[in-house]
Amino acid sequence: MRNNRVKSAQKAVLVIGAGIGGIKAGLELAESGIQVYLCDRRPYIGGTLSQLDEWFPDDHCGFCQVLPYSMEADEQYCLRWGLSHPSIEQLLLTEVEKVEGEAGDFSVTLSTQPSGVIPERCTGCGACEPVCPVEVDSEFEEGLSQRKAIYPRHPLGSADNTYIIDYQHCTLCGACVEQCPTAAIELSSEPERRIISVGAIVAATGFEEFDARPTTQFGYRRFPNVVTSTEVERLLSPNGPTLGELKRPSDGQVPRSVAFLQCVGSRTSENDYCSSACCLYAL
């Protein structure tokens, strides 16, 4: 005889990826009364959209396109600066290690990298940053500017203005520890593992931009003034490395002319499809 009993599903969902897709999915689930775990390996939410400024043709913020996200008008706020919802727990610097179980009852092991800074103590004063001896290319600015090994969690600033440590480049010299007025820095921090139970998993892992370096005929990374579309976005952004002025990375001068190269990475023997977006944003 067949057993018709159905195991009750966990009323919680894990959303992997805190870009605009993950944020939108998380908000809609949370507004439906479901507990949401929103995880991302980056130290901030927003993904690639955070690097983009105003959208064509109305010059609006891309994050505003998901509003309203709540039935309560007074709860609306700019998602570019942070996310706050009672049913959403944000798990940043976090990756999925293992998934076990079945639909309706998953057990997920998460690994969270240390930030090196106690957020409850950090005031965001920035006293630690100038004394850091390490400078590396800023991933957020696509290498157009540099940052320290200890730097703001969100490059644009947010409601959470705390700092984090890049342990891949930190020398553990302790200069930031001595400078911190609130004893918020812990250089000896270790990764943390956590197991959560969820009924479903949403994969909103986003995309990775094509690496144009192997296409040597275009001179990307060989010539400083050959840049990608995302790098141009950062140059044109008011909060970018040139404060919105289109300047050549080589000498900081305004270019007299600009050439757009389309279909880099597509329409090749390896990728014979059309990129579908580059013509639009070039125009």
Question: Where do the language-model regions lie?
Answer:
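Non-heme iron-sulfur electron-transfer modules
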Residues: R2-R5, R42-E75, L91-R121, P133-T171, ...
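Beta1/beta-strand and adjacent pyrophosphate-binding region of the FAD-binding site
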Residues: R5-G21, S257-L261, G265-D272
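N-terminal Rossmann-like FAD-binding beta1-loop-alpha1 element of flavoenzymes
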Residues: A12-Y37
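Glycine- and acidic-residue-enriched helix-capping/strand-helix junction motifs
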Residues: S70-M71, T215-Y220, S269-Y281
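A structural motif corresponding to the C-terminal end of an alpha-helix
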Residues: C78-E89
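Central beta-strand plus flanking loop segment that forms part of the substrate or channel wall
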Residues: P224-S237
